[in-house]
Each structure stands twice: as C-alpha cells, then as structure tokens.
Swiss-Prot record:
InterPro entries: CusB-like_dom_1, CusB_D23, MFP_Efflux_Pump, PHBA_efflux_pump_AaeA, RND_pump_MFP. Forms an efflux pump with AaeB. The keyword Glycosyltransferase does not apply. Keywords: Cell inner membrane, Cell membrane, Membrane, Transmembrane, Transmembrane helix, Transport. It comes from Shigella sonnei (strain Ss046). The lineage of its organism: Bacteria, Pseudomonadati, Pseudomonadota, Gammaproteobacteria, Enterobacterales. It holds the Pfam family HlyD_D23. GO terms for molecular function: transmembrane transporter activity. It is found in: Cell inner membrane. The keyword Transmembrane helix applies. Gene3D superfamilies: 2.40.30.170, 2.40.50.100, Helix hairpin bin. This is p-hydroxybenzoic acid efflux pump subunit AaeA. It is a single-pass membrane protein.
Length: 310
C-alpha cells in the first residue's frame, strides 16, 4: 500500500511540475512574442550635410573629425583673396555708375528746365532715356556687388548648430566645388530612436507610452517616450506594370508576415553618452508607466533578458 502511495505521489508531483513548467513556458512565450518590443531599433539624429555655396581652394581647415563644435564656429575657409578681388571690382563698378548717374541726372535736369524753347523734344527725351539706362546699369552693378559680398562671406563655412563633425573629408589645398558635401554635422541634443515594430505589437506602442532602450552589447537601459508612429509604409506586395496595372505578388493564405512600422522614441536624457547614430538597440514599450523591476516575476525577468538573444 505504501509503495502504491509513493508511486502515485511521485507521478502526481511529476505531472504538477510538468504542468507548471508548461504554464511558465507558455506565459514566457506569450510575453516574448506578443508584448510591444523589438530588437530592430536604431539610434538616429538630425544630420546636416554641410556643403559650400562657393567653389575654390580650401585655404584652412579649423576642425578635426568627430570634434564637438558650437553654432557659428568656423569649420573651414575657401580662397578668400579671389572673392575679395571680385568684391572690389564690383564696388568699383558701383562707384563708376554712381558718378555717371549723377552726371546724366544733372544733364537731364538741365535740358528739362530749358524745355523745347532751347532744344528739340527729341534731345530732351534722349537725355532722360540715357539717365534711365545708367540708373538700370547702376542697379545691376549694386546687385553684382551685393552678390560678390555674399560670396565673400560664404567663403567662411560655419557650423549651423551645436554638434559633432563627422566624416570630415576635406583638407587644406584641395579644390572644392559649390554644392559638394564636405562634412556631416550630427546635431547635439537631437538623438532619438527609431524602433521598427511589427504591426501586431503597435497596439501597445501608442504615443506617450514609456519605453526602455538597451543598446546592443550593453546592459545600460535608457528611458524614453514614444513620440509618434509612422502613418504608412511601402506595400512590397503590390507594384505597377508599364501600363499602370496593379501587380500583386502570390501569397500563402496560412502564412502572413507582419509588416514593420517605424516608431519614433524620444530619449529622456540627451546629456548622457548617447550611442552613435546608426547603432542598434532593443526597445521595450512598458506602457503608460515605467516598468517596476522589483515587481517582475522570475519568468518575466527571464523573458525580458531573452530578448537580447533573439
């Protein structure tokens, strides 16, 4: 009898343990697959592609790669003497036409005062027309001077905002053309995270919800808030042919791959050592409040850590 009870007890304990293990694994799996999280997330930032508005030789480079610069700080300078001479030439043209306009104004005024009693109407009109022509030439010379002044000012390339110089690929003595990108500036305090979440998990990733960001290869957890969700993504299953007809890819009815939608997350503390833009991270949306780790069960903590491994 005791042997039978002992065998029954062992069997019951085994069954209970198996059931508990199954429940734990099921809960962990549900939490792992259905909660709003993704490992496909990247740090991003506002990046300014800095290109000169004038062409010429680079005479001086004032910064080095990955340097933190302030707004208005000089990055590099382009051949100023050439543009200084162009400005002086334009100023000389303005001075010439100013003197000429003064002479023609006096001449036209004198002829208008004398009137048709002293000369023909044709001579009076001719003087007025010459004055108008000179005034137009003066206005054109002034515009050329202003443009030359603007070009001279833009030979000095300055940082448009506080940030980090990155991918600096210009050196003293090189010739750079107008509009060619010389350096990228990653704006300070503009970092955010783009989390590409599956459409089945968007319900738990609404704007205003709190999020945890864990950079790849780090145990540090950053805090943030869901800022916005993309309004649309490209439909990869539908294209158009040459005649404008829709082309729909064949699909298996029982296999449906969830689309990924970009979710923008605003970081709480921009003063921390933010990871470089483009690096990857794991994002977990915790809901309206931050997650209280002290109240997490063992299985939830385990599922939370499993996210780092796939």
């Amino acid at each position: 009898m005791k042997t039978l009870i002992r065998k029954f007890s062992r069997t019951a304990i085994t069954v209970v343990l198996v059931i508990l293990a199954f429940i734990a694994i099921f809960n962990a799996w549900v939490y792992y697959t259905e909660s709003p999280w993704t490992r496909d997330a990247r740090f991003s930032a506002d990046v300014v592609a800095i290109a000169p508005d004038v062409s010429g030789l680079i005479t001086q480079v004032n910064v080095h790669d990955n340097q933190l610069v302030k707004k208005g700080q000089i990055l590099f300078t382009i051949d100023q003497p050439r543009y200084q001479k162009a400005l002086e030439e334009a100023q000389a043209d303005v001075a010439y036409y100013q003197v000429l306009a003064q002479e023609k104004r006096q001449e036209a005024g004198r002829r208008n005062r004398l009137g048709v009693q002293a000369m023909s109407r044709e001579e009076i009109d001719q003087a007025n027309n010459v004055l108008q022509t000179v005034l137009h030439q003066l206005a054109k010379a002034q515009a050329t001077r202003d443009l030359a002044k603007l070009d001279l000012e833009r030979t000095v390339i300055r940082a448009p905002a506080d940030g980090w110089v990155t991918n600096l690929n210009v050196y003293t003595g090189e010739f750079i053309t107008r509009g060619s990108t010389a350096v990228a500036l990653v704006k300070q305090n503009s970092f955010y995270v783009l989390a590409y979440m599956e459409e089945t998990k968007l319900e738990g990733g609404r704007p205003g919800y709190r999020a945890e960001i864990t950079p790849l290869g780090s145990n540090k957890v950053l805090k943030g808030t869901v800022d916005s969700v993309a309004a649309g993504v490209t439909n990869a299953s539908s294209t158009r042919d040459d005649k404008g007809m829709a082309t729909i890819d064949s699909n298996l009815e029982w296999v449906r791959l969830a689309q990924r939608v970009p979710v923008r997350i605003r970081l709480d503390n921009q003063q921390e050592n933010i990871w470089p833009a483009g690096t990857t991270a794991t994002v977990v949306v915790t809901g309206k409040q931050d997650r209280d780790e002290s109240q997490d069960s063992f299985f939830r903590k385990m599922a939370h850590r499993l996210r780092e491994f796939g």
